[in-house]
Structure formats: C-alpha cells, structure tokens
Amino acid sequence: MKFKDYFKKNLIYILSFPLIVIAVYLPIVFNKSYCADLEYVQGAKGAIYNWNELGRYTLILLKKISFTPYNWILEGILFIIVSYLTLNALAYFMHLANSRLDTRLIFILSGIALIFPTFCEQYYFKFQAAEVLFGIFLLCLSGIFLIRTINDGEKLPFVISVVLTTLSFGIYQSMPNILLVMYIGLFLILCCTAKEKRILKNAFITVVIQFVLSFMANYLISHFLCKQGSYFSDKIMWNKLGASTCISYIKHYFKVVLLADSPMYSFAFIVALLIAYIALFVFFSKDILRVILTVLSIFGLIIAPFGIAIISGFEPDTRTQLALPFSIAFLLFFALSVLGRKTYKEEDADEGEKKDSKLIYFGIIFLALVLALNLIPSLRLVYTRYKIIQSDREHIQKIAGDLKEYNCLADSEDALDVIIIGTLPFYGDSVCVKSYLGTKEYILFSAFELDAHTPPTYFFSTNRILSAMETEGYYFKKPKVSNNMEDANNKAKDMPKYPENGYIKQYKHYVLVNL
C-alpha cells in the first residue's frame, strides 16, 4: 500500500493515537517547574551544558536552530508536534514490515513502544524531552528508508537512512540501543512473513552495513567535532569492580526489569516474553534455517535492551532504558504476525478474512491490556510529579516570601549568600509512587532533596533549591564557594526548623535557612 493510500485509510488513527502519548507526558514537559540541571542548561553558552563532551552534536544543533537552550513553552509545543511525527512514523515502519497486519493493532503496538515508565524519567529532563523523542523519530524514519532498500535495492534511501541514524545517535546515547532492537524486531517479523530467502539475506546484510556505517560516522563526528570527556569511560565498571561483581549487578538488573521490582518497570515485558514463547511453538516452517533465525532474533530482543548494562557492568540510569518498550512491542508484533499467518488461508481468502476479523478483535483487546500495563505506572509517576511540583511551589512561595525580609536579594550590591540546611522530602498521598531505599530516579525527588548529601553537605542542594526558586520568579544570591557550609551546619543545630518561627537567621557572611 502506497503512503498516500495508507494515509487516507488510517487518517483517524493517525490523528488520534498520538494524543495518548501527548496526554501521558505533557504534564511533565509542558510546565515551568524546576528540574535537575535546568539552571546549567539555561546558563550555558557555546557548547550548551556538557552535551559537547557527551557527543550530543545533533542535540546542540537543534538547540542552536531554536535560538535558545530552553524555553518551556517552545519545548512543550515541539513535544506535541514530535509526538505526532514519532508515533506515526513508527506505525508506518511496522506496517511496512508486515502490511497484512491490521493497522489498528500496529497503532496500539506503537503506543506500547512509546509509553513506558522509563520515558517519564527521561522526560523529567524536559529541556531535552522533545529532542530525545525527535531522535526516536529519526530512527523510525531511517527504518522506513531502509525497508525500501531491502525491498527494492535502491541506494539513495540507504544513504538517507545512514544520515538520519547518525543524526539520531548525536542526540542521546540510548539511540543505538533502540535502533538495535528495532532492526532485530524487523528481522524477526521478516522471518515470519517473508516468502523468499532473498529478502532475509538482503535484510541482514543491509541492516548490518547500515548500523556499522552509522556507528562509525557517529564516532568520527564525535571524535573530531566534540570535546573528549571521561563521562562514558567512567561508567564502565568491569575493570573497577571485577567481573563477578559486575555480573551480579547485571543479573540483579535483569531480575528487577523482568519482575517489575521497581516503579519504573511494568509486567508488560514478561507478558510479551510468554506470548512470544507460545507463538514460537505455534510458528512452523519446514525451513530449519528460518526457524533458527527466528529463535536467535527473539533471543536478541530479550538481550538487546540490556546492552547498556552489559557494556557498563552496572545497573544503568533508568532514563537510559528506552529500548525495553520497543522490545516488548516487537515481541508482541511477532506473536500477532504468527497468529495472522496461521489463520489466513491463501486458497480461501473469504474464510481467512473471517478468521482474521475475529483475531483482530482479540488482538485489540489483548494489546489494550498490555498498553494498560505500561500506562498505569506511567500515569502514577506523572501524577506523583505533579504533586511534587505543587508541594515544591508552596514551599518556595513561603520561604521566598520570608527571605525577602533579609539582605539576600540577588540584585542587591551587598547581598549575603543564602545557605539552606536540611531537606523537605515529599511523601504524597496513597496514589503517589513512594521513593524507596536507593532511589535514583529524579522524577521522585523534590527540589528540596536533590544533592543534599553530596559533599560538601547541603552546598549543592542549596544551589538547587535557589535555582528552583528562580523558576518561580524569586532571585536570591547563591553561594559560589562552600567556605561557610561547616559553620552554617553547626549553627543550624540550635535553630528552629521550617516552618516554625525563627527558621531563618542572618549572620555576618550569610543568611541561614534551616529546613
């Protein structure tokens, strides 16, 4: 089916399904509240924050094009636009992989790939939310061009695919992992649907060459155009912790993901594994090689999302785990493709269409339930973040109102530094996701908790809190050095705590706030 016909036939889904993605994440992205590192992005010049040494050349380029490191209104609008582009590009990529599968199923699968709790943590860093999603859009678009090369052998779409993939790699470090899952998923679907071995051979060779060329191009661009830092090398733990320790971390991480032993994951992964396992037994082919390739592809979809953990030898930051929902979607995509293949009879099209119609309704209900497995924990995280923002705003207004009575306004010539001792943890109601022992996810932290125990104690958290106040329009002088922190910690021990009277005191060199 040509894109024009596909567009006309599926217009209602093209317009409506992205609204689900937008509704889930927009409360996080489209607001002016504080998030960690926002002050560094807004205050950065030239290279923009530390993105240059991270090799995020495309992200820097996109910020240059928009003429601002961060504007919350612009970021929100861009996120809406890119959500439409990304979900529809992913749906069309899946449609090209198996055009016989009902497009309603494909649109739900696209939603499963793009709605997941780990995306909430990623989009908490809202100053790059639209750009990260745009990177995924580039991968989907690249995949569309790649399928044209696989089917028709055209060279120009292949070149475009390499360029788009390279640009995507320059946005965020998780993009190669997502692409790996997408290509393994594509190959898995072709194992199920391709009638000729030639297509499988072309797909394998084309995908490998494209991935290698894109990876090399990204490496060369990063090496020659970006400042070389130690951010990624510092995260490799194999030489620092030893093989046995690293393996234990990887096993623990796999267990956490598989059993959803964290609010950042769902049971959708294990459900998808079970369904794919059943489909594998249903799948039948006299071609032994095709069966072997199918088994290897499924194994690849299981392992690929853990690529960052395997390379680093440690449990990665949750916000980098963006490949897992794509793996879930493609495992389910395989299962539906197998069922469609077994129920459809080439020699009796009418009978096959009747059987397919029943299968479609069953598939829609089943996929909707899997989508709900991703949607419910994601919405809990979004709700929790909303409540944290409300709580922070109330504290900021109260404390900032009291601080105005002291000599610490940022625009005063003789202003004293503000030092804030203590934290204000967020507890929330029964619906909120509770922080747990060892919580690393920023989305669960109040602005009054960030970096509190990073040495020197309360120095960095003070600057975080004052930056959060700036997002609400309150500007107080930040401490640039930590010389007074020890003295402030000692004095705070004898002071009342917020919100009791006397929780703020002015001393010779600073104004002290005791939380």
Residue ranges: model-predicted function:
Residues K2-E53, Y57-T58, K63-L87, Y92-F107, ...:
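Intrinsically disordered, polar/acidic, low-complexity terminal segments
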Residues I22-F79, S83, L87-A89, S110, ...:
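Transmembrane catalytic cores of multi-pass membrane glycosyltransferases
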Residues M94-T118, F137, K155-L156:
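Transmembrane-helix signature of polytopic, membrane-embedded enzymes
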Residues L109-Y124, A129-I147:
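Well-ordered mid-protein domain cores that form the structural environment of catalytic cofactors
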Residues L133-N151, I160-T165, M182-C192, S327:
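Specific aromatic-rich, kink-prone transmembrane helix
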Residues G135, E315-T343:
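Alpha-helical transmembrane segments of multi-pass integral membrane proteins
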Residues I364-L375:
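Hydrophobic membrane-insertion alpha-helices, especially the h-region
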